[in-house]
Amino acid sequence: MGGIVGKPESATSTWMPETKLEAKMVEAMQRRAAEGTALKSFNSIILKFPKIDDSLRNCKAIFEKFDEDSNGTIDHEELKKCFHKLEIKFTEEEINDLFEACDINKDMGMKFNEFIVLLCLVYLLKDDPTALRALEATFETLVDAFVFLDKNKDGYVSRSEMTQAVTESGEGSTGRIAIKRFEEMDWDKNGMVNFKEFLFAFTRWCGVGENEDEEEGEEKN
């Protein structure tokens, strides 16, 4: 996401967000980056995977509650009802932007992993989302992880920043690991990763969504 003006890994002003939502994400992440991070290594992020996974799976009850037709996805109307019930105050335009951004398959419905990404974006963009307080620690860890990777604090993670973050752990074969992880995040292949792309990759790393797909397959057999 975003457009290049000059080299993609230079100063903040050379990388321009393509949408209002992306611009808001970048601005919010830059503010958060100014506060710093307690994480010291990429390994410290990996060690948090199991705990984060368990916490995110607790969102399943919320997801199923608002998936009123039980088709495994939340459509636009169900999302608006969800926001109203959780007292998340967004404008119609903001809801539309969030839905479009998180519906990566463009099938007019959000699967569980897409719903998790949306809730985390809500957490990032709202100053005090009290409705999400139960997930605050988990979402803050995800924000913290992105801040750790974003070495120049411009709101994006570049390939060189990912390599630096992974190689700091000092283990062997870290260069290949860094490139693989970066490619998993950079799904639009533009050389820069925003927070949304990071979240989708992180849910895959933790296994969120994979087990749900397997369970659906078993039910059909």
Regions found by a protein language model. Give the residues of each.
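EF-hand Ca2+-binding helix-loop-helix modules
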Residues: G2-S70, H76-K80, T91-A101, K106-L149, ...
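Long amphipathic alpha-helical assembly cores
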Residues: R181-K189
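Eukaryotic modular interaction domains in large regulatory/scaffold proteins
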Residues: E140-R176, K180
